[in-house]
From Swiss-Prot:
This is Ribosomal RNA small subunit methyltransferase C. It comes from the Bacteria. The gene is rsmC. It is found in: Cytoplasm. The lineage of its organism: Bacteria, Pseudomonadati, Pseudomonadota, Gammaproteobacteria, Alteromonadales. CDD domains: AdoMet_MTases. One of its GO terms (cellular component) is cytoplasm. It catalyses: guanosine(1207) in 16S rRNA + S-adenosyl-L-methionine = N(2)-methylguanosine(1207) in 16S rRNA + S-adenosyl-L-homocysteine + H(+). One of its GO terms (molecular function) is nucleic acid binding. InterPro entries: DNA_methylase_N6_adenine_CS, Mtase_sm_N, rRNA_ssu_MeTfrase_C, RsmC/RlmG, SAM-dependent_MTases_sf, Small_mtfrase_dom. Its EC number is 2.1.1.172.
Amino acid sequence: MLTNPSQVIIRNQETLSQHRVLVLNHEADSLPKALLDVAQSVDALALDYHHYLHLAPQANAKLRCYFGHQLPHQDKYDTVIVYFPKAKPLAPYLFNLAAQHLVADGQLLVVGENKGGVKSLVKLLPKYFATGVKLDNARHCLLFGSSLIDTAPEIKLSDWTSQYQLSTPQGNITICNLVGVFSEKHLDQGTELLLSHLPTLSGRVLDFGCGAGVIAAALLKAQPTLSLECIDINAMALASCELTLAANGMTAKVYPSDGLAQTSGKFDGIISNPPFHDGLASTTSIAQRFVADSAKQLQSKGIWQIVTNRHLPYSDTIAAEFGQLTVPAENNKYKLYSFQQA
């Protein structure tokens, strides 16, 4: 089953005949493999770990699958396909990355849903690309084409990172935020509620949905001896978290995980402001699965604490998994749940 943007690419796949193709920011479908019907070879870079896990089992000699914010090599391609990102500020970064991997006069294809911001493509394309041309309009999506006409600047993460000081109940910390990663450049109310009632932890602690590393840095600021693990599904978030920890002289294990699937063993503490945005729609499925899985991975005497939006229906799921739990704090927008394992 192909997503609507992928179906639009298939409608125009004749432009990829015998091309070496790179697909950036692909979705959770088999489009890269399907392109092998016409392309010479296909490489795919996922920025969402779930999308990578969907495609990776299909890899073969002509299809290489990667996860991260950059490729681990400098290979060049005849065509780069970019799926227009849900987080619009990420688009210029993806165009810069595409240019790094295109041959001279190489083809750029950009596809996206009409409601997702792709209509602004022509204005967003950097000057080292030719003016974008609309190639197709179908499945509530648009496909644009362009070509590389000039040398693009080398990608430096520092050019795509905003750095700022954040005041937390644990003290001031430095946050490094790559484009496309959620940040209000001040402590959001949910995280503030969580950090204002942070329990004393010890041993092995998990920060689920770490984002740019705000909770991680605050945890280590207050309790520097923790063995902290930070997980997220988003490559830009993981890179941001690593930069944040480095900027504060802190260390933690930072790695991708689809829910808790890539974690192992039990934790003495699990802390989170769970993500509740999936693409363009608000959803609770990620957090509900996290609640169910984390209940199984909490060590004896371990502490579990999360903050959630009041309007999201977590209460029943949490009660079903943990039974007796406390609400240390709440306000008109957020609610803090806490549980200690017997």
